[in-house]
Swiss-Prot record:
Keyword Phosphoprotein: no
Pfam families membership: Ribosomal_S8
Keywords: Ribonucleoprotein, Ribosomal protein, RNA-binding, rRNA-binding
Function: One of the primary rRNA binding proteins, it binds directly to 16S rRNA central domain where it helps coordinate assembly of the platform of the 30S subunit.
Protein name: Small ribosomal subunit protein uS8
PANTHER family (alphabetical): 40S RIBOSOMAL PROTEIN S15A
HAMAP family in UniProt: Ribosomal_uS8_B
GO biological process: translation
InterPro entries noted in UniProt: Ribosomal_uS8, Ribosomal_uS8_CS, Ribosomal_uS8_sf
SUPFAM superfamilies given in the database record: Ribosomal protein S8
Molecular-function GO term, any one: structural constituent of ribosome
Organism annotation: Chlorobaculum tepidum (strain ATCC 49652 / DSM 12025 / NBRC 103806 / TLS) (Chlorobium tepidum)
Record Gene3D superfamilies: 3.30.1370.30, 3.30.1490.10
């Protein structure tokens, strides 16, 4: 069955794997998903990711990160802009949870966090929020 919202699928797979305490999860490959994985790795929400090209289809293996007490590093992750209701933010992007969490945006300069978008003075589509 085809996926209509690949970013929501990406978020759901990570959230479900974290809830099940899985060490890794496999996500079908797209460039956007690879860029999101790279951003989550840079911000410390996942341990690592690897792009695996198999005979059938390429996928991304994401290694999840857990705290010392066994809690998932991602407390909350949810989609903001959806296919039926797009959400855009101008240059004056507000902080999520006073700067504790992040908004992830798709901008003309690529996929950026809210802080990076403010520094580069660009706005864009708010893909999801993470804490």
């Amino acid at each position: 069955m085809p996926v209509t919202d690949s970013i929501a699928d990406f978020i759901t797979r990570i959230r479900n794997a974290g809830s099940a305490k899985n060490k890794t999860t496999d996500i079908p490959y797209t460039r956007v998903r690879e860029n999101l994985s790279k951003l989550l790795l840079e911000k410390g929400y996942i341990k690592n990711y690897t792009v695996i090209t198999s005979e059938q289809f390429p996928f991304i293996r994401v290694e999840l990160k857990y705290m010392q007490d066994g809690q998932h590093a991602i407390k909350e992750i949810s989609r903001v802009s959806k296919p039926g209701r797009r959400v855009y933010q101008g240059k004056d992007i507000k902080r999520y949870l006073g700067g504790l969490g992040l908004f992830i945006l798709s901008t003309s300069k690529g996929i950026l966090t809210d802080k990076e978008a403010r520094e580069q003075n660009v706005g864009g589509e708010v893909l999801f929020r993470i804490y």
